[in-house]
Amino acid sequence: MMSNTLPEQSVNTTLAPLPGQPDYPATWPADALNCAQIKQHLDAFQQWLGAAFDDGYTAEQLIEARTEFIDQLLQRLWIAAGFGDTPDTALVAVGGYGRGELHPLSDIDLLILSRKRLSEAQAQKVGELLTLLWDVKLEVGHSVRTLEECLLEGLSDLTVATNLIESRLLIGDVALFLELQKHIFSDGFWPSEKFFAAKVEEQNERHQRYHGTSYNLEPDIKSSPGGLRDIHTLQWVARRHFGATSLREMVGFGFLTEAERNELDECQHLLWRIRFALHLELNRYDNRLLFDRQLSVAQRLRYEGEGNEPVEHMMKDFYRVTRRVGELNQMLLQLFDEAILALTTDEKPRVLDDDFQLRGTLIDLRDETLFIREPQAILRMFYMMVRNRDITGIYSTTLRHLRHARRHLKQPLCYIPEARSLFLAMLRHPGAVSRGLLPMHRHSVLWAYMPQWSHIVGQMQFDLFHAYTVDEHTIRVLLKLESFAKEETRAKHPLCVDLWPRLSHPELILIAALFHDIAKGRGGDHSVLGAQDILKFAELHGLNSRETQLVAWLVRHHLLMSVTAQRRDIQDPEVIKQFAEEVQTENRLRFLVCLTVADICATNETLWNSWKQSLLRELYFATEKQLRRGMQSTPDMRERVRHHQLQALALLRMENIDEEALHHIWGRCRANYFVRHSPNQLAWHARHLLRHDLSKPLILLSPQATRGGTEIFIWSPDRPYLFAAVCAELDRRNLSVHDAQIFTTRDDMAMDTFIVLEPDGSPLSPDRHEAIRHGLEQAITQRTWQPPQPRRQPAKLRHFTVETEVNFLPTHTDRKSFLELIALDQPGLLARVGQVFADLGISLHGARISTIGERVEDLFIIATADRRGLNNLLQQEVRQRLTEDLNPNDKV
């Protein structure tokens, strides 16, 4: 005889409503079970959820209330559909709904379970029930399976098996449901060890999709490492092996201490609060904390502050919680490993010294009180991990003792002399970062060692440029630096691999990297504050004067090379001379270029490309030459022109060109043209110009990458708005301009060179060349300038603001002005800048384009029509026009 009594695993259907809560479905009259009224009740309940959350009810209370609400609704509808007294059928909650975790937009996953296939009439009833649920706008996922089908599907599909393991009977045949439970918890259905191994592999694959870190600036609350899924993994494994249905029951089985349970509860509470608030802000299910949602979620959670401070406070809490979850997850899965797979329990540990032993490949304490008695032993353990490649991690019980000792430290570890000696010895070892600093960071020992580190843990930056939090970025800088010692890195970073063995004391660059962003988030110039911090570190750790000066200089100037290469005219000898004067020595230069490359690569994986590589190489070798030549020496312009012409001529003579015609063309060009192009570029231009009718436009696209990008060369009668027209066409084709050299011959022909890249930072695909050439021909031959129709701003930029800044930089000449533009990146920006210059009768001679996330930081070399720098009045007019044009009142 079938019973409608629910088993003990079910949510209590007598859960009392919270004050002000709409009635539960169990109390509705029978005539309320129609589409219109159900939807009305659901809408009222959803609105109440938001109001109740804002009034201070916890996410736990409201999740329980929503789960109960949906439970009762489904029970009523199941009976109304005619299944109330039908044997051998059951309605089962699975997945997150089975766990009783229904956030405002969570899917409602259902299993319609039967002993044998449903009859046609039953199938029709199920279809009508599901249609009603969809009509009232519930997000319902469902499967209709027999008991046998459940077991067969579950055996072949880990996701199905997991859903079944956390299934919960809503209504129906209890005996049928218990039979399902009996089968899925039997040894024949996903044995415990097989299930554990599969879930660990699944978690590892999921972590890889997020680059192994929860510290992405737009994390997924559920799936990012350290997120809710990592807690679920622990629950699934414990449920399958121990039968534990809650964290509290895991304590009873001895695999979780009460303190660890409380910690996981705290972490889950914060993650649930953020996820609940996010769902209230959205209309469609999503668990990603994207930039455009972060501020509204933070404000809903009552984080305070000006501007983006609420976001930074919320995200710092989020990242710190995911760090704790990640560490607990690692430790507890290892404990499960020992209990379930029994891989190491029978192995006799190998003694390493008086304090440590090796269990398999994991380092283990021989005396569990060691870290409390001798805190410096914590550093001894990590130093041993650095020196011994056999050690791949920390044994679970030792990790538990480490966590306990870490919480009971009376002072930072760096105040202990032996700990300082061990830390420096670790930094001098080739595996210092990957086998020492990285695990120290993961287990919050870097925080325990350096008080300053605590300030940047979880510190985010609300922009599109930085992909990681400050601490995660710093660790990635350190890992990149360590990679320069490996030959396999040469293909991507040949210069740094060449320079690494020539660094005097490579540990110094690791110290500089640790501190280069340590002062972010404190207010003020983080480079200056970081340099002050490193002086204290150097004194405490006994660095000598020369070493101290080097690391402090590197921190103070860690942005110098990047800014100079990307935002200054590095083909100007004066720029090179000023940079060399700042650097002073070749040793500093070697350190700085390695730190700069690592910093760029670790900021955002999309930033590093062959264009940036070419800029830094060019700046490095030009500076090295300047340092060897001496500060008083500057290259002679006429000699450089002559040298480039002779080398280009040598290349062309191999092709039997008409030298008289060549000299006629070159005679029309000004000196700057020869200085700012390589002999190969000069030969390439000349080769095509000699075969061309010079009265007509010529457009060339380089077949191979030039300085990391594709070079576009344009020969055309000069006219106003030419630069604007070219940039508008390139923007229309979604190409990024990174460099422009604008020249006009003595008889007013434009000779313009653009370095362009695809959006992903690669040179242009050859199959696009012809279409781009044709588009540019049309653009430059138009008789009148027609500003392009403004395009919509990309969605990812709409929630960022960057105030437009126009700065005129100091210059050593009165023949040109250097304009630095900082503005919000936006479609058609270069064309609009070019239009302003043309409107004001200003000639553009060069441009260096740098896009940093949502910001553009561009350099323009400009002059008046009579080749003079801009006076104060004209500078002010340019500043006003650019500010007005790039800060429109209504963004499209």
Curated annotation (Swiss-Prot):
Cofactor(s), names only, from the UniProt record: Mg(2+)
Chain segments carrying region Uridylyl-removing: 352-710
PROSITE patterns associated with the record: ACT (PS51671), HD (PS51831)
Polar residues: bias regions: 1-15
Keywords, alphabetical: Hydrolase, Magnesium, Multifunctional enzyme, Nucleotidyltransferase, Repeat, Transferase
Pfam family name, one: HD
Keyword Cell inner membrane: no
Protein name as catalogued: Bifunctional uridylyltransferase/uridylyl-removing enzyme
GO annotation (BP), single: regulation of nitrogen utilization
Domain ACT: 711-790, 818-892
Swiss-Prot/TrEMBL domain comment: Has four distinct domains: an N-terminal nucleotidyltransferase (NT) domain responsible for UTase activity, a central HD domain that encodes UR activity, and two C-terminal ACT domains that seem to have a role in glutamine sensing.
Region annotated Uridylyltransferase, chain positions: 1-351
Biological classification of the source: Bacteria, Pseudomonadati, Pseudomonadota, Gammaproteobacteria, Enterobacterales
CDD domains: ACT_ACR-UUR-like_2, ACT_UUR-like_1, HDc, NT_GlnE_GlnD_like
Gene: glnD
Protein species of origin: Cronobacter sakazakii (strain ATCC BAA-894) (Enterobacter sakazakii)
Ranges where the record places region Disordered: 1-20
Function, as annotated: Modifies, by uridylylation and deuridylylation, the PII regulatory proteins (GlnB and homologs), in response to the nitrogen status of the cell that GlnD senses through the glutamine level. Under low glutamine levels, catalyzes the conversion of the PII proteins and UTP to PII-UMP and PPi, while under higher glutamine levels, GlnD hydrolyzes PII-UMP to PII and UMP (deuridylylation). Thus, controls uridylylation state and activity of the PII proteins, and plays an important role in the regulation of nitrogen assimilation and metabolism.
UniProt catalytic activity: [protein-PII]-L-tyrosine + UTP = [protein-PII]-uridylyl-L-tyrosine + diphosphate; [protein-PII]-uridylyl-L-tyrosine + H2O = [protein-PII]-L-tyrosine + UMP + H(+)
Protein activity control: Uridylyltransferase (UTase) activity is inhibited by glutamine, while glutamine activates uridylyl-removing (UR) activity.
